[in-house]
Amino acid sequence: MLYAGLDLSRKRLDFHLLDGDGGTVEVGASPPDADGLRGLTQRLERHGAPIRAAIESMNGARFMHDRLELAGWQVEIADA
């Protein structure tokens, strides 16, 4: 299992991917649209592990949640 912290802004989705011991696996960003999320999930598939993510509740978080869950991620929306 890998763990992703997601930070959504109007222009991009930043992510920090951690392993089970808390070590950084990958850090990056993606456009916050359907094509960007598709590219992000395809990019992170190469790690070969399920991903559990958290994203702050804000405009666009539900869209991110739904798209990433369709790609097989487990996503939680956190209230700030």
Predicted feature locations:
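Phosphate- and other anionic-substrate recognition elements at nucleic-acid/protein interfaces
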Residues: 1-80
